[in-house]
Amino acid sequence: HADVENLALLCKVWGFMKYYHPSVRAGEYDWDRELLCIMPSLVSLPSKEKRNEVLVKWIDQFDFKKKNGIYSLCASDSIKLLPDLDWIEDKSNLGTILSDRLKEIRDAERDTASYYVNLGVINMGNAVFEHEERYSKCTFPNIDYQLLSLFRLWNAIQYYFPYKYLLKDNWNEILLNHIPLFLEITSRMDYESALKRFIAEIHDTHAGIYGGPTKKYLVPVVIRFIEGKAVVTEYYELKSEFKEEKQILQPGDVILRINSEAVDSIIKRITPYANNIPAMIYNAIAHPVAQNGGRIVICKLVISLLQIRSLFIAFTLKV
């Protein structure tokens, strides 16, 4: 537990310096590499005092011009959300020296432009994260790079997600909860699952993992959830050569299972990865059915709670 708390603090300090430290935000250091170098030093420490000492020594390696005067924030009605920097004032946790170092960085003179974030007019003010190494040759398990990806994401949302104030859960607690999940990754599938679980915490369907297999197959029907059931409600328009496939499913059919797994079970299994429940339901049912020709669906037509007919079908309709 102490190691998780130490790594969480490292995440916060590293991200804070990435976006606030004048030299770091200017791209003068390989900031990923600096994280990977310091990370082992934050494990198995005897006390938080020793942890804070290690972090102070690390921070002091990156010099900058200190600002004289009292720090103040610009008060404006146009500011909806300010970054949460209260944690750097917590001397009971950070100690006086570390807290003072972080406040000096907060108050430092720095250029408006950042090497890592583009907020230009061409992007309509949206944050575009630049100069982030992809590490495409990374294999799993690799704890250092697994944590790097989590730290990148957590801090990007910490400082640039405009709807962070709407999150119902404490963002610091979310970090503590997800570090163990990223430490347990043993494969690429585990890695993608951990990312999906983390992304789901912000409840925004614009966020997700993109890429992967293309959609080669299509179920030629519209599936909607009605009273908690996956119900076929209408058809898609098909090319003439596929017209005979149209009769496989009928409006009113209820999808019960996919690959022998009950729909309710599928939804329960993937809910932790859902950043939007309606979209999750679609992706859980319609997309898996359509992804390839080997999917099997068992359906039944229900009218007034009476089962009229059952179907055992394998979709092989190619787009």
What kind of region is each of these model predictions?
Residues 1-319:
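Flexible, low-complexity junctional segments that flank or bridge functional domains
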